[in-house]
Every structure is written in C-alpha cells, then in structure tokens.
Amino acid sequence: MKPYQPVVASLLNQLRPATILDAPSGSGWLKGLLGFETRMDGLDLFARPPATYGVFRNVDLDLGLPDDLGLYEAIVCCEGIEHFGNPALFFKTAREHLVPGGQLIVTTPNVWYPEARLQFFLRGFFPSFPCLVGRIERGTHMHIMPWSFAHLYLFLRLNGFEKITLHDIDEPKPKRFYERLLGFPQALYCRHKRAKSLTEEERIFWSFAGSAQSIHGRRLVVSAETPNPAVQVTLRDKAAQRP
C-alpha cells in the first residue's frame, strides 16, 4: 500500500460521504479501504471499470469533468493532477460537481523537498518529472506539472475552494540527513512569514507551508471544501445575535 492511500481512506471514513467520484480511479483500490456504504463512481482514461463502482467512464480528465455528471459529496483525485496540462479546468469543474460543503481530496508528488530542489538546481528537472523529448504523446502517463503545497493552494483558492488543509503522511521527514540542513532556511523563512501574518488565512497557510510534510515530504495529500452558504448564513445570524 502506498503511504498516501490510508490517509485518503481515513479522511473519507471520517466524512462518510454518501456519493464519491474517484477521478482518476486507477485500479479502484479506494472502495476497498472504506468502512461504510457509499455510491462510488469512477473516471479514468486507461483503466477498466472496477467491479464495485457504479457509473464508470473512460474520460480524458485534462478536459475537465464531463458536464453531465451529477453532484457529489466528495471528489477524490489521487496521483492525477501531475498529468494534467490544464489543472485549473479540472479544479473548476470539480467545484461545479460538488455539493455546497463538499470535499475535494487531492494527492500528488511534492517537489519542495530539498533533494528535489537540489536535483532541479543541478539538472533543471525535478525527480519524477524528467525531460520527455522523444516520448511526448498526449494521453500517456506523463508527469508534466510539478506541484508544491503553495502551488496547489493557489489553484484551489483561484477556483473558490476553502478550508485548504495539508495532511500528514507516515513517511520519513526528512528522508536523508543532509536534507535537514538544506531545508532549514526554508523552514525559517516560513516561520518568519507566519509570525508576520496579518490575517488568519495567511497564518494558516504559512503553518502548512512550513510544516515537515510540506518541506520534507515526498507526497502531498490536500483536502479542500466548497463554500456552504447555509453555514455562512448561520454564522452571520449567530454573530448578529451577540450582545
């Protein structure tokens, strides 16, 4: 089992959404890790329909989610966005297919860890994101879009998501001793930015950005929520009732 998989399953087992879209679904491993009944649909360019899934389609997710999909309480995108040339379209259409207060869970390789940044400095390419000249073919398993927590946060906020959270993965952080030394300036910078934050959003962002998972982790698991107008109205009403 890959280190990010139990983290994703744990989040869903806590949320217990009645409807889930798994895109890309791959082998359909996710359904087997859930401890509750749910309707799970899947989208994938290559994979065959998993036996336990409901609706399944072969879809190029680089074109976004299909317009005629219904609404879901959760959408999961494991190891997908690094393959997308147009991730903003995916996030936009994911929000359109989530109910108010719905959850998006994303996993992807992280390129902020010190060894990755050192390799980029020496070669110009991140680990797992090699030069693809001579192998460029649309629709194949190419890693074309490197991500850090900061970049993922930006794309999610641009597409209207809230409560963006970076989740811890059980992996060595750092993996190598020298990475602790190379990662220290970045941790110090994030700590300084957190101390200078003017808003709660800034403080939360820099706390996640400066965490061991963000600076030293090899993978990212990030969840985000669509706005829920009903909750916002309730909070405003409660605030108005205070003496």
Regions found by a protein language model. Give the residues of each.
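Glycine-rich phosphate-binding loop signature in dinucleotide/nucleotide-binding domains
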Residues: Q14-R16, D67-G70
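Class I SAM-dependent methyltransferase SAM/SAH-binding core
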Residues: S25-G64
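A short His-aromatic
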Residues: E79-H83
